[in-house]
A protein has these predicted regions:
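Catalytic cores of RNA-modifying enzymes
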Residues: 1-209, 238, 249, 258-261
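C-terminal lobe and adjacent flexible extensions of AdoMet/dcAdoMet transferase-like proteins
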Residues: 190, 207-264
């Protein structure tokens, strides 16, 4: 009997149990013509279930031992890439056609991976959706609405580019070894932003700046960013039609877009 792979703490590995891998494949709803990229296949619980149902499956795994273990039983339509997904050329892959994303993300790098996917979508397109397993608290931040404690930079920047829906919630026992937290599977359906932005980088910079002071009034939270661009925060807020006594966490994406345009 082949030994089960050992999860490595330094990679934040928690391997999905077979019954939950079946549920995740059902939630993904793969089609025979689909091309997929899987982030962190681990020992292949999802890989080996998904591959027979799709045209191509590219996997990116940082752990060389897991890649070696998968090589012996991966189907011919699976491409195994040893490396860090944060360094992977996703734009090169989508040149051949759309690529759906799936992955059980390590908790310690889930946010950088989310921002990489957003950046790749912005630059190259070709990513219809991403079905991602995340720590439940991270999922809650992405789903959060204006005025709630979880609403912030991650909520705004992810939902600027994608519709978000929750597919599954998983207990710690869905993984081996069991983490100390619950997990959730979100589906991100990538699309153009629902607002018009002349300078998206300035928008992102403003959002990050004002949310470092999310409990201050907008008049004060906006001031450092506005002054750095030669603009008065009170004038910009008035021009955008936003009450300067509100707090950053109460603004929706449309209000933030208007404000960014006035400052820029």
């Amino acid at each position: 009997m082949k030994a089960r792979p050992r999860a490595r703490k330094r990679y934040g590995q928690h391997f999905l149990e077979p019954a939950w891998a079946d549920k995740l494949v059902a939630a993904v709803d793969p089609r025979p013509t689909d091309r997929f990229l899987e982030i962190g296949p681990g020992p292949g619980a999802l890989t080996l279930r998904l591959a027979p149902r799709v045209a191509q499956l590219v996997t990116v795994e940082i752990d060389a031992e897991l890649i070696a273990a998968l090589e012996s039983n991966a189907p011919s339509n699976v491409v195994l890439v040893h490396g860090d997904f944060l360094d992977f050329d996703l734009a090169g892959l989508v040149r051949a056609g759309p690529v759906r994303i799936v992955g059980n993300l390590p908790y310690n790098v889930s946010t950088p991976i989310l921002f990489k996917l957003i950046g790749d979508h912005r630059r190259a397109g070709g990513i219809p959706d991403a079905i991602l397993m995340l720590q439940r608290e991270v999922a809650a931040r992405i789903e959060a609405s204006p005025g709630t404690k979880d609403y912030g930079v991650l909520s705004i920047l992810v939902r600027l580019h994608a519709g978000v829906s929750r597919l599954l919630t998983l207990p710690p026992g869905a993984f081996r070894p069991a983490p100390k937290v619950h997990s959730a599977v979100l589906r991100l359906d990538f699309r153009p932003p629902p607002v018009s932005l002349r300078d998206e980088e300035a928008f992102e910079e403003m959002v990050r700046s004002i949310f470092t002071q999310r409990r201050k009034t907008l008049l004060n939270a906006l001031r450092p960013f506005a002054e750095a661009r030669g603009t008065d925060s009170r004038r910009a807020l008035a021009a955008a039609g936003i009450d300067p006594t509100r707090r950053p966490e109460t603004l929706d994406v449309h209000e933030l877009a208007r404000l960014a345009e006035e400052v820029a």
